[in-house]
Each structure stands twice: as C-alpha cells, then as structure tokens.
UniProtKB/Swiss-Prot annotation:
InterPro entries: Dxylulose-5-P_synthase, THDP-binding, Transketo_C/PFOR_II, Transketolase-like_Pyr-bd, Transketolase_BS, Transketolase_C, Transketolase_CS. Pathway: Metabolic intermediate biosynthesis; 1-deoxy-D-xylulose 5-phosphate biosynthesis; 1-deoxy-D-xylulose 5-phosphate from D-glyceraldehyde 3-phosphate and pyruvate: step 1/1. Signal peptide: none annotated. PANTHER family: 1-D-DEOXYXYLULOSE 5-PHOSPHATE SYNTHASE-RELATED (PTHR43322), 1-DEOXY-D-XYLULOSE-5-PHOSPHATE SYNTHASE, CHLOROPLASTIC (PTHR43322:SF5). Binds 1 Mg(2+) ion per subunit. CDD domains: TPP_DXS, TPP_PYR_DXS_TK_like. It comes from Microcystis aeruginosa (strain NIES-843 / IAM M-2473). Homodimer. Keywords: Isoprene biosynthesis, Magnesium, Metal-binding, Thiamine biosynthesis, Thiamine pyrophosphate, Transferase. GO terms for biological process: 1-deoxy-D-xylulose 5-phosphate biosynthetic process; isopentenyl diphosphate biosynthetic process, methylerythritol 4-phosphate pathway; terpenoid biosynthetic process; thiamine biosynthetic process. Belongs to the transketolase family. DXPS subfamily. This is 1-deoxy-D-xylulose-5-phosphate synthase. Mg(2+) binds at residues 144, 174. The keyword Transferase applies.
Amino acid sequence: MHLSEITHPNQLHGLSLRQLEDIARQIREKHLQTIAATGGHLGPGLGVVELTIALYQTLDLDRDKVLWDVGHQAYPHKLLTGRYNDFHTLRQKDGIAGYLKRCESKFDHFGAGHASTSISAGLGMALARDAKGEDFKVVSIIGDGALTGGMALEAINHAGHLPNTNIMVILNDNEMSISPNVGAISRYLNKVRLSEPVQFIADNLEEQFKNLPFFGDSLTPEMERVKEGMKRLAVPKVGAVIEELGFKYFGPIDGHNIPELIATFKQAHKVHGPVFVHVATVKGKGYEWAEKDQVGYHAQNPFNLATGKPIPSSKPKPPAYSKVFGHTLTKLAENDPRIIGITAAMATGTGLDKFQAKLPKQYIDVGIAEQHAVTLAGGLACEGMRPVVTIYSTFLQRAFDQIIHDICIQNLPVFFCMDRAGIVGADGPTHQGMYDIAYLRCIPNMTIMAPKDEAELQRMVVTGINHTSGPIAMRYPRGNGLGVPLMEEGWEALPIGKGEILRSGDDILLLGYGTMVNTSLQVAEILSEHGIEATVVNARFVKPLDTELIFPLAQRLGKVVTLEEGCLMGGFGSAVLEALQDANILVPVKRFGVPDKLVDHATPEESFADLGLTSPQIAQQVLAAFFSQKQTANVG
C-alpha cells in the first residue's frame, strides 16, 4: 500500500508487519522531502513514526481520541489522517499548519503549539466522556521535553486520583526538548532507559498468586501487601513512582519496534483507570544528520537532503537579533559574574548557546518551566544577582502571574528579554509574539523597551543590565537585523524613557516602536514624494513614554500616526492615545499594528501584507486619512 492511499488511520487495521514497516519508511521519506523543501520541524516527527503507526493500528479513530503534545511531533499523524496530498503546503500560506488545529482535521482533537497541555486536555475529555456515559479511548502523547512542564505534572497528579477514569498517557522519551532535557525528572528517566527493565513478573503476578494453594482468589490483606511490594520490585524505579501516583505503568518500550509497541498498547488498552506507557525513541530517527545533531535538526530551514546542509542564501544576511543578543550578553557577563542567563529549554533559539558554552556557571536552563524561570530570577535578584530571563514572547505569557506577583509587586530588578516578539511567520498563531506590549504595559513598576535595529539592541542589553530600580523588559523580533554596524564593546546605556527624532518635518508625526521604526522612515520617504514631510520618532520605550518629546510634537504637527509590530488593543498606539487624552491633547491619531484577529501561518512578508502593514500600504492609508486631496492611486 502506498502512503498516499491512506486517507483514514483505520486503514492501518489488518495490515501485515511488513506493510506497516513499509508505511513507516514512506512516512520518513515524505517527511524528509517536505521539510528539506519547505523547512519546519524535522527531528521530533522522525522519532515517533513507529509509535504513531502502532498506536493507530490498535485504535478506532472514528471514536477514539488522540492528543499530541506540543504539536510539532505530529507530522506522521498528519500523513496518516488524509493530508498526504497537501503535505507539501506545510507551514505555507493557506496550507496545512505546522502544529495541530481543530479546524484543520477531525482527527486533530485539541490544538497544540505550546508544551505540556495534552494530559490536562485529555483528562478533560475523559471526564466529559464519563459524565455523558459515552465509551471511547483517550490517549495523550507527551514528550520532546514537555513532561518537564509543571502543567503536565499537575495533570498527572489529578488523573492519578481518578482510579475509575480511563486515560492513557504515552511518554515519547527522546531525552530532548529542543535542546537536551534538563533537571531531575529527565535524569531519572534516563536512568531507566539505560537499565534493563525488570518486569518479568509484573504483568503476570496476580495470576501466579491466584494459583497458589490455599490462597486462590481470597488473598489476605497481608498477602495483598506482599503482592504490591513484589510489583514495585518488578518495575523500574520510574515505574514505581508513576504507579505510586495512581497509574499502571508499562515500559520502557523500544519506540521503533512496531510489534512490541502494538503488543504493549493492546495490553495497556485493557487496563481500567489511568495508564502510563513509557516509550524510548530516538529524535531524528532514520536520518543520519538529525540523529547526530538532535538540537540542530529539531527544526530546519530548507536544506540539501543528501548532505544535511542548509541551502545557502543568494546573498549574505546580517546576523540574527538573537545572535547579536547572545554575543552582547556574553561579552558583558565575562566581566560581571552577577549576570545570570536563564532560558526555558531554548538555549539555541534564544542565542544563549554560546553563553552556555563560555560561561556555564552563569547559565541556567530550567527546562520547559517558564513560571519557575521567572520566580527563580526573582530569588536571584533578591540576593544581588542580575538575572536575565531570555524567553520567546509567546512563552513568557505562560508566566504572567509570576511576573506580577513575584517580580513587579516586589519591584525586583529582573531583565526580561523577549525573543520572537511580533510576527513570527510559519509557526502561526500559537507562536506569534503579539501580546507582550499589552500584557506587560498594564503592570506597575515594569519598564518596556524595543530596539529599532541590532545596534540599538546592544545598547538596550546594557540598559537592562544597569537598570536596578525595578523590572525591565526588551522585545526584539525573529530573524536578521538590518545590517547596521555593530560594536564589540563600549556600548552605552540609554536614558530610561527617552526616544529620539530621526527625521524632521512639518506636516505629520510618525511614532515608530521597535521594528516599525524602519518602516516609519520608509513611509516618510513615500509621503515626501507627495509633498508631505513627516517627523519620525524612534520611541524606544512604550513604558515610560517620552511624553516630553511626543506632546510638543503632537501639538505642533496636529496629526499623529503610531506604528508597532504587536496587537493594537493595549499596545503602543493605545499608550500614546491614552497619554494624549490624559494631557487633553486632542489631535487625530491613526494606529497601525495587528488588529483583534489571529495571524495564521505564512511568511512574515505575507503576513505584513495581509495586515496592511507594508510601507506603501501604510503610506496609502495615511494619505487617505489625513491628506485625501494629495492621495494618488498608486503609492510605492
């Protein structure tokens, strides 16, 4: 059978082992060919091919529900659920998503992009099933580091207290998240993977006791305790812990042995109550380069399938913002042992990999545990350290309470560095960094800044380190800088709450924030072609706003435009409007940013165009709003 013929996972039923293994081979081929062409997550999906096939061979997917944690593990799932012919559109505009979306397929039972959610959602579905008197299986597949997240442990704690609720948790244990897993839980699991399973009597122990003379089915309480003690000896240490939490434990199982997986899943389906299946997999399985470099091949831009090397750009690109950040922080930390770099399982993505290599004693990776990272930083700050919490904007929102309760209320000098702020492109709505301005701006004591380019980012890193009077946050985008000259040292801190005028004009005020400062300058050039001269301000800070600069300009010019790469509700434009209103400066203001809508996966350029945020589009709208008599049909 060819993989393209599978439009429903139930078609796996009845296939021979040889056929299933051939399907596994085809999945890997399609997966590799597609990611090599489009880019995307490579290693996670390659590691769960056999797991997916074996599990789906034992389920009725017209009834049963499978939830995939994180979502980027689920590419084989997509290929087995009718999306083969669309798989080439993965992560492309109007194509299939790189994560799970309920609206994309009836087999995507719960949307996933962030980690550690599957057990909670699965338990909710299981409880709803029982309340309605229905009968179907619920399976939550967690792994790729997600078990280090506190939410997953909270769900395990809850499920373990529900002995009559049938739910299966499968741990895809590949010893990795994006980077290698860290922490005691990971170390504990690794010990189990490396030891020989001693389950030789666990599965059949009860039957053996029933056959004993005199006891039979009426075991005394004393013998029951003996039986339970022997069970604990007969499973690996982690199994004993899981069983103490209320789950029946199976494993560890070879995650690339289809017959063993099928047999284990069939046995696990017979268990009444919560069951935990521990599956040991290899991230990147079947592709030599991905197995050797599991961090580098977690996700890839388009690459040469034969060599594993990225397809070179047609022209050299400036360094990425994250690389500039990591380099600058490392240089500063070399001379200041108080600086502690903190990440949540994202060393490479946030640019802290070089920091980790050079200054391991000043580096902390907490795993997928953003809440812990923030409060940990608070404790470090209390003792005079300079903690730098480096987390993607979309993931920092998971620690909102800790930012308020543990940092801002106590006014602790923690430096938050929010990578991937703004439009992120192909990762789609679960990963867009749209909301950080709004969710941080409302918190007392917080200072928020954004650089216009990579050189200003260097100065803001110094500013954040030097700011000791309270918490401070810096947002910066995914991707490459503008190519401006960088300094190796001697960076100067910026004055808090002060912007700068980049261009002077007498007709309109353009207030740019962060990445949109460069766009503001481009808009000003277009307006100038129409005889309109704009003053362009690099705001630098959204909190505190530079009202000493903005107010006189707004009063004199009488027309204000704000530009930001974030949500309009509660964002930079809202801050400007509020400040002008409070000061009774009642001038017309037009805001440009992301409206109240989700931004789907596409290239950043496509998203900007869809949102009307390209320089020509903005110039056209400014002309229409303020200078209709000068508007032309074709701008830019």
